[in-house]
């Protein structure tokens, strides 16, 4: 429309019609959408039927031209509630934090000209009797710190460990643009009400081949989604580390399982004859002396196709090798990925 092409954003629930955008006090859902055209801005749309239909609102929530950094990369808004007010993180280029009392009119709280990312996210976790905040940089890297008022402005302050470095959030080659989902606001520092926070990533990458996948494999869409992951924090030697665990609901998808306890050798392939398009393998290895690598060949085919999942005992590294995994999109796609 006149505001530009619509890109990514997020949805928040206005339970009390604080925005005055809805026809009743029951409120509804507000979508915050990037509009790209002569710079970027955040526009609004609303739904009063739980997301089945949407109506654009003639209102710009925030515009790059009004931002102190004057940077046209002003996209990927993520909205959350904390301490009785609404917050929005925006980036695409440098990170900004905005706040609002009514979900419609927003003011800048703090800017981070040297911290660039797409798809920013900011959410809390309770650990060691306190609330810590995780800043996601596109789902690839993260920082842990505090969201607090500094000189009257809400500011993300990273922990000392994360001031000049990031934690690695996802080692997967095809994992980007993470988004989190949850069912309520986060409460207050005095009374936090932090729900389970679930993360979902785009299973593709801008690094090399994302725009080649659909054509090579005959799809009409660009990528798919990774597993849903439950977010957590863990204190490791005084440093808070992000944890990501597949949600418990995946266990409901389990079919009949098979258990093996055996010594693996050249003549007793435990998975020989096993067929399936998706499966879960839970394993424990007790390597014999001199063993250097253990792992699995999965999705094997009669034409030599296979995907290798290998743990290297000497390097203490796990490796995914898909150089023979069917259609090869590009050289980058075929590269071995280790962590």
Residue ranges and their predicted role:
Residues 1-23, 51-81, 90, 106-124, ...:
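Surface loop/turn signatures of beta-propeller and other carbohydrate-active proteins
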Residues 18-32, 85-87, 129-134, 192-199:
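Entry beta-strands of beta-propeller and related beta-repeat scaffolds
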Residues 35-39, 140-141, 206-207:
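Short glycine/acidic-enriched loop and turn motifs that connect beta-strands
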Residues 121, 126-144:
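Loop/turn-rich, solvent-exposed surfaces of beta-rich toroidal or solenoidal domains
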